[in-house]
Amino acid sequence: PEKGCYHGAFPPLYGFDPEDREGSTDQCAVALFEKLVGKQLSMILWYQNMEPGRNFSEMQTVREKYWGKNYQGKYRFFLYGWLPVIPTQQMANGELDDFHKSYFAEVAAQEVRDMGPIWFRPANEMNGSWTPYYGDPTNYVKAWRRMYNIAEQLGVTAYNVFVWSPNSVSMPGTEANAMKNYYPGDMYVDWLGVSC
């Protein structure tokens, strides 16, 4: 926005007291969260593994389910937390190329522009030792650019948003693992996000 910030959340059902759940078994507790904080979310984050067998239709179903309006009367942004399950060297070498081609072709074919752009947040917190793709900035950058180039070739980057999102603190806190080393470059990133 021109001023302020977008209020978003990843509101899973766990953490809510059973009486607060009001009988809900929904995995994404959007209504409960909004009731708790007294605001409507402008953005919702949902995770999906970046691996063969997963597809855009799964995410589009979730998006349609939680597609609502924020306090400004605009539709919520839907942020896809896309998590690789293989090391960055394998991604940089093209092991996910077929997956990305298939996934982005599906995005291009199913894109519903009335719902607004899709916000892709691939391989976030790459500077944190808890991810399988941390500790290799050179190959991370190659992998990101490779993925982005495929999306661009299929026309997905013209309308959708790619969010680069490191952790606020690098762990380990070495110079080699500094978040700046993982940055793919302005040509490959639309927005910056930080996990705190």
Language-model regions: role of each:
Residues 17-37, 55-65, 100-105, 173-184:
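Short, acidic/polar
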Residues 46-166:
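Substrate-binding cleft of extracellular glycoside hydrolase catalytic domains
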Residues 167-171:
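Short, catalytically relevant binding-site loops at active-site mouths
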